[in-house]
Design a protein with these regions (language model features):
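Outer-membrane beta-barrel transmembrane domain signature of Gram-negative proteins
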Residues: 73-87, 151-185
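Short loop/turn motifs that connect adjacent beta-strands in outer-membrane beta-barrel proteins
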Residues: 5-8, 38, 123-133, 146
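Flexible, surface-exposed loop regions and adjacent strand-edge segments
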Residues: 12-18, 58-68, 149-159, 165-167
Length: 185
């Protein structure tokens, strides 16, 4: 199962993959064998691999949808004419959806769940009528790896234009360097 998000992202801005999406792969195998007339063995294997990808600002896309819902198309430009990133809001520190998608980095979470089930059945009917024995063993494993490269871009508030026509920008949010994290579970 592969699902890409419907967001339009600029692929040329950065040198890493910040795509938003969900991938899920399932594998299942059941093997039953009669080892002898009185011995049956069953083996069940299953694995599920899930990869979730998000923008760097959060572990989901909720903030992106909230930001999008609170903005009209004319509230704030995607970018200022000089390429600076705009801030908006009462304290001029909020980011538009374009910035959240393209300038905050990425987070990827890979999860793997595996199960092995082994069942052995022995029929002792040849020695004692109706006697059977059964043994079952099961092993489950879960692992997760989360990797992220997050950052905050510099955001500016435009107070108008200077006499030469350039924007009069005030930095409202300072840029932070990339922060790399990796967590295993």
């Amino acid at each position: 199962q592969h699902k890409d998000a419907i967001y339009k992202q600029d692929k040329g801005i950065k040198n890493y993959d910040n795509s938003v999406g969900y991938n899920k792969y399932n594998f299942r195998a059941n093997i039953d064998a009669n080892l002898t007339k009185s011995t049956i063995i069953e083996l069940g294997l299953s694995t599920e691999i899930v990869t979730n990808s998000f923008p760097g600002y959060a572990n989901d896309t909720k903030a992106l949808w909230q930001t999008q819902a609170n903005l009209t198309p004319v509230t704030v430009p995607v970018l200022y004419s000089d390429g600076s990133l705009p801030a908006y809001g009462a304290s001029a520190d909020q980011q538009n959806p374009y910035i959240l998608l393209n300038y905050t980095g990425y987070k990827k979470k890979n999860e793997t769940t595996s199960s092995i089930r082994l069942r052995l059945e022995q029929d002792f009917d040849q020695w004692i009528k109706g006697l059977k024995a059964e043994a079952t063993m099961s092993i489950n494993n879960y692992s997760a790896l989360t990797q992220s490269q997050t950052k905050t871009p510099a955001l500016y508030y435009a107070q108008g234009r200077n006499k030469d026509g350039s924007l009069n920008l005030i930095e409202k949010v300072a840029k932070t360097d990339d922060k790399y994290e990796s967590t295993n579970l």
